[in-house]
Amino acid sequence: MNNFRATILFWAAAAWAKSGKPSGEMDEVGVQKCKNALKLPVLEVLPGGGWDNLRNVDMGRVMELTYSNCRTTEDGQYIIPDEIFTIPQKQSNLEMNSEILESWANYQSSTSYSINTELSLFSKVNGKFSTEFQRMKTLQVKDQAITTRVQVRNLVYTVKINPTLELSSGFRKELLDISDRLENNQTRMATYLAELLVLNYGTHVTTSVDAGAALIQEDHLRASFLQDSQSSRSAVTASAGLAFQNTVNFKFEENYTSQNVLTKSYLSNRTNSRVQSIGGVPFYPGITLQAWQQGITNHLVAIDRSGLPLHFFINPNMLPDLPGPLVKKVSKTVETAVKRYYTFNTYPGCTDLNSPNFNFQANTDDGSCEGKMTNFSFGGVYQECTQLSGNRDVLLCQKLEQKNPLTGDFSCPSGYSPVHLLSQIHEEGYNHLECHRKCTLLVFCKTVCEDVFQVAKAEFRAFWCVASSQVPENSGLLFGGLFSSKSINPMTNAQSCPAGYFPLRLFENLKVCVSQDYELGSRFAVPFGGFFSCTVGNPLVDPAISRDLGAPSLKKCPGGFSQHPALISDGCQVSYCVKSGLFTGGSLPPARLPPFTRPPLMSQAATNTVIVTNSENARSWIKDSQTHQWRLGEPIELRRAMNVIHGDGGGLSGGAAAGVTVGVTTILAVVITLAIYGTRKFKKKAYQAIEERQSLVPGTAATGDTTYQEQGQSPA
């Protein structure tokens, strides 16, 4: 019997250990098992992962990969997951090409061309924040150069995912967290979690990967070389090819070391050169093409990628345990988060290097290259605030209010009109002691105190003042840049204002630098072209609109001005306009990463959704009260659930329940009263019985009294 119990316990422990292992550990076990059995390497170039299409960076694993069947590529060279299939290249696919890239706007990635060229609303900024692109753009602009690129590419496999692939456990868990927030109407928290999902898994999922290796040389030449050269573009690309062949030893029979006049001129005009080995053995000077190609076998990498947007994989087939309508809401929430990521990293401006309005940081052209600047008067900013909740010790508006220095009040000076830029809610958590009396049976009372966390809220409204009529010269404020807790002032390269300027508070943490000293402050003054936000446009774009503030205005800058991001305030971007050519120096900005939405300080109360009905296919889902899992409901269960929801079942309504509670309390009070009364009456009867018993023996009582009296009189 003991042996039987021991066996049962052993198998239970083994089953628990097996079920308790994370999926990642199970994959490691499967990989090692296959490597031991087949004595083959594992193919590491795999699709099914997340991809950031702005930065060209691999992200977290979206699709689950397992190695239970120990599958191999068709040529038997590598172990591959069960959910992957490969298309081997039966013949050696060695490609060599040379190209001229005259502008960074036409740049194409060497390793993610296919996924970057997808057609979408934001495809123009795909790859614009990759290290490869930013290096090339910086060199082209700073050196006034063009780029030539020569590359040798060797494609070995095309690796694709199986359409029946399942989501990874980590990605699936994050989707379930978002769905849980959505079903409980916690939209703000769901938005925040969706933005975290984009941060961890990117914007796309790779569905196909080209595995191989590439050897690339990029040369940057003075732009004047191509313009002044009497030869054709083909001659320049040929010179680039010769330079590459001198770097990599091709060992051709024909001697390419002899340089003609054009090749020598090419080399003399080269301002920068880089050779990059992607896959294969590491590059070193003098390496032969044959040696590099032979080292590819065990050093495969991705040399191109294809994929689909992240939300495409959030569908009922991938999440069969959730109701269809809820899955669609999750997919839409994630899609919106991806669009917001693209929007906040789109920098409109003039992209023509030859234009005086050129904006180095712009990655999309907005047609502002031809505009001429107009001087505008800046009437200042101010911010109103109204406290909505909180006690007297938590005064939020003291650090949110800002008066206009030109008026000393929350207003604009004469000749200026206010532009309501944005209204938002500011939240701060605070703790306070909350005490109340707690009584039992209305008799036993005590004071109970507890430390309670609550949220104080205040609404702030930001305004800036635009000239609505002719105003006297030097009547407004000088603008000296701005900064926040996460950005610096381009005028000072620090979180500060120039000399002679003072900061005005706007939003929660933006500081706008202004000056009223036209004599000393003009040295650092910057021509200002207005503000605009995600909700309100810039009335200075059209002078006629600035006179009629009731008319809608465009969310852009007037001619001759370039836009720059001021800050992202709780998911809303606020931009400002300055004279083109200013604030565009230095290095290119990195990608602004999510989340952009603040999470709520306190979780909203759950509505405890228990049933979801899909009107399209008349299917209803019920949430199990024990397991909290969704499942398709049976007709009987649906009727029972609806009865509970609408109060038609056997349960009591709120009023009935209250009546029963009052009745039970009354009966209990009566019983307690009767018990107290009965106890007192019983004690009274017992006392009378003793008196009657004492009266039957009077001598005893008299003797006692006499003795007491005698004892009291004897001393006298």
From Swiss-Prot:
Summary of the function given for this chain in its UniProt record: Pore-forming protein involved in both innate and adaptive immunity. Plays a central role in antigen cross-presentation in dendritic cells by forming a pore in antigen-containing compartments, thereby promoting delivery of antigens for cross-presentation. Also involved in innate immune response following bacterial infection; shows antibacterial activity against a wide spectrum of Gram-positive, Gram-negative and acid-fast bacteria.
Any one GO molecular function term: wide pore channel activity
Intrachain S-S bonds: C34-C70, C350-C369, C385-C397, C435-C449, C439-C445, C534-C572, C557-C577
Expression (tissue specificity): Expressed constitutively in a variety of cell types including macrophages, natural killer cells, neutrophils, keratinocytes and monocytes. In skin, expressed in both hematopoietic and non-hematopoietic cells with expression detected in a variety of cell types including keratinocytes, fibroblasts and endothelial cells.
Activity regulation field: Forms arc- and ring-shaped pre-pores on top of the membrane at neutral to slightly acidic pH conditions and converts to pores upon acidification. Undergoes transition from the pre-pore to the pore in a processive clockwise hand-over-hand process. In the pore state, 2 alpha-helical regions refold into transmembrane hairpins (TMH1 and TMH2) in each protomer that form in the ensemble complex giant beta-barrel transmembrane pores.
Name of the protein in its database record: Macrophage-expressed gene 1 protein
Cited SMART domains: MACPF
Similarity section: Belongs to the MPEG1 family.
Lineage of the species this protein comes from: Eukaryota, Metazoa, Chordata, Craniata, Vertebrata
Species name: Homo sapiens (Human)
Signal sequence extent: 1-17
